């Protein structure tokens, strides 16, 4: 697996509101599986390699954005590839191992420093471009999930809802999701108390409670609104506790000399 390095110039950004974790489709919802049709059409026209790329982690309050780019082997495509949000964690892990064993792929992370410095959108697009650049073979065409183009030398085709339509994007969504989930579990060991291993940094009630109690960690995104609010509340609590300690110390000191 190739991992792209970080770096680049800063950009201005505004405070961001958190988004909840995306959910898998409910039972009974129509689920049209992504297909390899677009990649095959290009391949038959002599355009190859064709990559799909996707990112995970725009919405959470903590942790990096992880992007992946995948070029599937037309002769060895794992069965069951789908939008990562439609799969259980166990099935994602299984497909991850099959994809990385048969496909060409690369991942890139936009760390918390870049997210705070640039803003979440720029950091996400940067990570997507870095993942494509890190592929072992330069693609001639790239499908990217969403509406935004990325800064790459080859043809770039945004596909809204692409992780549910284009098979190589779906594969990239699985690689990015599993990689980020594993990174968040590692952060949970390095920074205990927030429950990163459970919610992966999203703004669920347990995470918000821990933020209010512990204050933000170095892995939290400084300009996301719940983090800003938690930081201010935590400072107020610390200031109140400090004032209480000072008053108690002064009382003890006075009593000691009476």
Swiss-Prot record:
Location, primary (coarse class): cytoplasm
Reactions this protein catalyses: Endonucleolytic cleavage to 5'-phosphomonoester
UniProt xrefs under InterPro entries: RNase_HII, RNase_HII/HIII, RNase_HII/HIII_dom, RNaseH-like_sf, RNaseH_sf
Cellular location(s): Cytoplasm
Taxonomic lineage: Bacteria, Pseudomonadati, Pseudomonadota, Alphaproteobacteria, Hyphomicrobiales
Record keyword Nuclease present: yes
Keyword Cytoplasm included in the entry's annotation: yes
Protein name: Ribonuclease HII
Sequence intervals crossing the membrane: none
E.C. number: 3.1.26.4
PROSITE patterns, per database record: RNASE_H_2
Top-rank lineage group of the source organism: Bacteria
Underlying gene: rnhB
Key words of the record: Cytoplasm, Endonuclease, Hydrolase, Manganese, Metal-binding, Nuclease
Disordered, as annotated region: 1-20
The family this protein is said to belong to: Belongs to the RNase HII family.
Signal peptide as annotated in the record: none
The species this protein was found in: Nitrobacter winogradskyi (strain ATCC 25391 / DSM 10237 / CIP 104748 / NCIMB 11846 / Nb-255)
Function: Endonuclease that specifically degrades the RNA of RNA-DNA hybrids.
An MF annotation (GO) of this entry: RNA-DNA hybrid ribonuclease activity
Gene Ontology biological process terms, A to Z: DNA replication, removal of RNA primer; mismatch repair
Manner of cofactor binding, per the entry note: Manganese or magnesium. Binds 1 divalent metal ion per monomer in the absence of substrate. May bind a second metal ion after substrate binding.
Domain RNase H type-2: 48-236
Cofactor names: Mn(2+); Mg(2+)
Composition skew (Basic residues), residue ranges: 10-20
Residues noted as binding a divalent metal cation in the record, renumbered to the chain: 54-55, 145
UniProt GO cellular component terms: cytoplasm; ribonuclease H2 complex
